[in-house]
């Protein structure tokens, strides 16, 4: 099973569009994919993509129907990950691969990196794709290193979203 969770906040708007297109493509190829989006809240959007022939409709539903704002709509990875763990952690198992997508810019909120550690202990693999250049990682409010220590790898996504 593949769990995919993507930041769709303003700081990664172009990347978010790319990741939603990726979700659409992956869900069309595999039967056991669950997709989540977050800002400071998190929501499962698997059904938004399932059986949808028009990716624009699926993305529109994510943008208008997904419950991803908890307080103020500024990224809070820690809170989103805690809610994920509370609601869906029981579904992560030894056959699960988790793909996390985002810049890890947390607006100086608590990282709650323990959640990623717990997920990694239960899952087969955990990977992180970050759209920012590596030179930006762990600068300012970026806490990708806090999370990365609990993954099987953090990679810069070689995005070309302007071409999409």
Question: What are these model-predicted stretches?
Answer:
Residues 1-2, 160-164:
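Short, small-residue-biased leader/transition segments that mark boundaries at the very start
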Residues 3-20:
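MIDAS-like acidic motif and immediate structural context at the N-terminus
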Residues 4, 35-37, 98-100, 128:
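Structural beta-sheet core signal
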Residues 38-63:
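Short beta-strand-loop
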Residues 78-125:
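Exposed acidic/Ser/Thr-rich ligand/metal-binding surfaces
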């Amino acid at each position: 099973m593949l769990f995919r969770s993507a930041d769709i906040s303003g700081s990664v708007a172009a990347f978010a569009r790319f990741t939603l297109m990726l979700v659409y493509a992956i869900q069309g190829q595999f039967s056991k994919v669950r997709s989540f989006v977050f800002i400071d809240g998190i929501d499962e959007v698997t059904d938004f993509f399932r059986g949808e022939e028009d990716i624009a409709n699926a993305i529109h539903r994510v943008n208008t129907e997904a419950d991803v704002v908890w307080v103020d709509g500024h990224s809070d990875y820690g809170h989103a990950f805690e809610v994920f763990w509370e609601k869906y952690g029981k579904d992560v198992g030894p056959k699960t691969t988790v793909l996390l997508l985002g810049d890890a810019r947390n607006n100086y909120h608590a990282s709650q990196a323990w959640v990623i550690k717990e997920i990694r202990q239960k899952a087969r693999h955990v990977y992180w794709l970050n759209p920012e250049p590596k030179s930006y990682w762990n600068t300012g409010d970026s806490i990708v290193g806090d999370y990365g220590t609990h993954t099987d790898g953090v990679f810069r996504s070689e995005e070309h979203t302007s071409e999409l």
